[in-house]
Amino acid sequence: MLDKLDGALRFQQEALNLRAQRQEILSSNIANADTPGFQARDIDFSSQLKKVMEQGRASGTGVSLSLTSARHIPASTVQPPDLDLLFRVPDQPSMDGNTVDMDRERTNFADNSLKYQTDLTVLGGQIKGMMSVLQQG
């Protein structure tokens, strides 16, 4: 039964994970806006989500969970997928080779943040719906 619940929530979980990783990439771009030669990077969110949904996340050296009771359910550790980072082509290249366009980065950052919040709301609604079904029997 737990595998069915996991399958029902997996898409939103993976979308949230990718949005969080993209937010880190975008914040790195913003932080390095004045670094000479820094190349702005991003990911193609839809293709990365499709890749993760098809291939799954690799088992590996992610965060391990400790079991303090024999009744705890063991969990396998997973690590974030290897993202295909893309270099952004600048609209106006700077003299120092930096390709960060702050307007574009801020817009992408705000857009990604809004979509992250939306995904959280959808996931919360799914969980509330499942809880309602379970409570009603």
From Swiss-Prot:
Pfam families: Flg_bb_rod. Transmembrane segments: none annotated. One of its GO terms (cellular component) is bacterial-type flagellum basal body, rod. Belongs to the flagella basal body rod proteins family. NCBIfam families: FlgB (TIGR01396). One of its GO terms (biological process) is bacterial-type flagellum-dependent cell motility. Structural component of flagellum, the bacterial motility apparatus. Part of the rod structure of flagellar basal body. The gene is flgB. Its main location: other. The keyword Signal does not apply. This is Flagellar basal body rod protein FlgB. PANTHER family: FLAGELLAR BASAL BODY ROD PROTEIN FLGB, FLAGELLAR PROTEIN. The basal body constitutes a major portion of the flagellar organelle and consists of a number of rings mounted on a central rod. In Gram-negative bacteria, at least four rings, L, P, S and M are present, whereas Gram-positive bacteria lack the L and P rings. The rod consists of about 26 subunits of FlgG in the distal portion, and FlgB, FlgC and FlgF build up the proximal portion of the rod with about 6 subunits each. Keywords: Bacterial flagellum. It comes from the Bacteria. It is found in: Bacterial flagellum basal body. InterPro entries: Flag_bb_rod_N, Flagellar_basal_body_rod_CS, FlgB.
